[in-house]
Amino acid sequence: MEKTFSLSRRDDGIALLTMDVPGETMNTLKAQFAPEITAILQEIKADSSIKGLVLISGKADSFVAGADISMLDACETAEDARLLSRQGHHVFAELEGLNIPVVAAIHGACLGGGLELALACHQRVCSDSSKTMLGVPEVQLGLLPGGGGTQRLPRLIGIAKALDLMLTGKQVRPKQAVKMGLVDDVVPESILLDTAIEMALAGKKTRKPLKQPLVTKLLEGTPVGRNIMFDQATKQVLKKTQGNYPSPLKIIDCVREGMAKGMEKGLEVEAAHFGALVATPESAALRSIFFATTEMKKETGAGDAKPRKVAKAVVLGGGLMGGGIASVTTTKAKVPVRVKDISDKGLSNALGYAYKLLDKGVKRRHMTSAERDKLMALMTTTTEYRGVKDADIVVEAVFEDLNLKHQMVRDIERECGEHTIFASNTSSLPITQIAAAASRPENVIGLHYFSPVEKMPLVEVIAHEKTSPETIATTVAFARKQGKTPIVVKDCAGFYVNRILALYMNEAAQLLLEGQAVDHLDKALVKFGFPVGPMTLLDEVGIDVGAKISPILEKELGERFKAPAAFDKLMADDRKGRKNGKGFYLYGKAAKKGKKVDESVYSLLGLTPATGKEAGEIAERCVVQMLNEAVRCLEEGIIASPRDGDIGAIFGIGFPPFLGGPFRYMDTLGAAKMVRLLEGYQSKYGDRFAPAALLKAMAAEGKTFY
């Protein structure tokens, strides 16, 4: 069997330990490496000619991307996972215990177990490359750093900074890493190895003392101060997670125990908590999301079809969506983009939008002003169809007006090449209707982004019956280059995400009209696990947008999509939400003292607000509507699989990740229970709760989606 670790000796007494996992593009730590690395460490101990050790990666742009998550699936019990953690502790303790200087030379991803490996070294130096990122993202998988990270990290950079890294899973760049003391030096990649060797030759085996301001020292250096910090961190975690995620609290406990009772006790607690977390349904759900997105990256969305190269893009419309799409095309995909708008105002808006986002990067020192200007130069503008002929893809982001979109299709077919893809960012109009104006319908596709474009990870790629496989594959590849997670969905009003969202929002509106207070509704769904409640979401998206989409969905999909008639009163009162400072909540000066409901909405709708219903019942009524419609979408072939439905709901509307998505959640509940819930509500509130035929069939046969 090919080895992962190789040891080479230099004449100056420095040994290089190179990690290079055979057949993989990135290094990941696996349990089966333990005997191999242990044997090498014994060899180093026995060789008195070795005066220092440098750890490097044999991969081009990856130090160690973390532990191989798939090995956790082999753990049948919490005890199996605890022992896996203890095995890692033993190996890292052996490395840390070497009586020669050990230096980690880091270039590329240094994450999770990779950073824990580096923390077990005596010193760390990293390259200044944009590809170098350091962090412990285990919390995002419902886990904690199980290789000693909860103990070594706070001792190296301080408790507050360590908790911030571990509780958020955020990754830091080289300059941030050296500033916080995570690494000892940052150098160009070309001299990384030489610098690491010099550090090893210098013979420093002890860590630099932690430099902290006096207030931080008082807090972190005394039991009373530490308890204040841990209690505050716990409060913040519970406020953010609503208690739905167990791992952040376990991370705090590991640090608390380790700082109070010493490193060895801390490691024992870390392993025990790691084992327990691996066995939780929350971690299983979060790991399933990780595996699903990893798997999706390998798919074209169109079988064996090969994507064409996109060397130039055009965006039609310089509004909020157009500006965002143009921005991610230049900054993420690094593809030149030409923005066309009928007005100079629209064009300056698109340029301003992109500049503002890039300038944030400069202010945060993620890039230089020269790098910002280079990316801005990729974006050009026009009010006429000039400089668009060589475009490989045109993304249309104009008003939801079918006649206008037909005009855009005809214009692009006239002005661009015969292979140019026309991708519509429509949120509700069926692509088949848009393609009706095309003489080359095989080039027409839907590419539905979510707002704000730079933040929302999902795009829906919508193929109509005549869309060619090559067009699908090219559009999917283009979306991935923009940093998006694309799901391919079948053409239908509302597609997938807006369709399941519409019924959820309609049910929330029904609850409001039954007298439930706006903030009571929102709190119930946030407690369930959504990032924001439905009324806040409607204010953010725009009440007018909802009012525009509802009739389209009702016409195409039936009575159950009919929006409550009382919403006409909101439109008559010009309530559009945050965009015009008038919605369910107060905005501007009236909202200075925190988020407050605009009480006038109750009198407008003829309501007396109450908080009579339990939060659980409110959430259940809204959520079962979403789940039931997701099943209908699967039944109709709108989505290709439960996996795509889960990813679409989590990344598109913030369905609680710890539940794994609508379909995994239904598997947890059981199809029979889902049918009982729906039929119970159907008898009370009518046929909008009628269970999907597929769900009833699954309940009868005891089947699951996965």
Swiss-Prot record:
CDD domains noted in UniProt: crotonase-like
Catalytic activity: a (3S)-3-hydroxyacyl-CoA = a (2E)-enoyl-CoA + H2O; a 4-saturated-(3S)-3-hydroxyacyl-CoA = a (3E)-enoyl-CoA + H2O; a (3S)-3-hydroxyacyl-CoA + NAD(+) = a 3-oxoacyl-CoA + NADH + H(+); (3S)-3-hydroxybutanoyl-CoA = (3R)-3-hydroxybutanoyl-CoA
Stretches for region Enoyl-CoA hydratase: 1-188
GO biological process, one term: fatty acid beta-oxidation
EC number in record: 4.2.1.17, 5.1.2.3, 1.1.1.35
Keywords, sorted A to Z: Cytoplasm, Fatty acid metabolism, Isomerase, Lipid degradation, Lipid metabolism, Lyase, Multifunctional enzyme, NAD, Oxidoreductase
Positions of the record's site feature: Important for catalytic activity: 116, 138
UniProt entry tagged with the keyword Chloroplast: no
Signal peptide: none
Compartments it resides in: Cytoplasm
GO (cellular component) term, any one: cytoplasm
Region (3-hydroxyacyl-CoA dehydrogenase): 308-706
Residue runs in coiled coils: none
Pathway assigned to this chain's UniProt record: Lipid metabolism; fatty acid beta-oxidation
Pfam entry (one): 3HCDH
Gene3D superfamilies reported in the protein's UniProt record: 1.10.1040.50, 2-enoyl-CoA Hydratase, Chain A, domain 1, NAD(P)-binding Rossmann-like Domain
Gene Ontology molecular function terms on file: 3-hydroxybutyryl-CoA epimerase activity; enoyl-CoA hydratase activity; long-chain-3-hydroxyacyl-CoA dehydrogenase activity; NAD+ binding
Subunit structure: Heterotetramer of two alpha chains (FadJ) and two beta chains (FadI).
Function as written in the Swiss-Prot or TrEMBL entry: Catalyzes the formation of a hydroxyacyl-CoA by addition of water on enoyl-CoA. Also exhibits 3-hydroxyacyl-CoA epimerase and 3-hydroxyacyl-CoA dehydrogenase activities.
Family per record: In the N-terminal section; belongs to the enoyl-CoA hydratase/isomerase family.
Name of the protein in its database record: Fatty acid oxidation complex subunit alpha
Organism from which the protein derives: Shewanella amazonensis (strain ATCC BAA-1098 / SB2B)
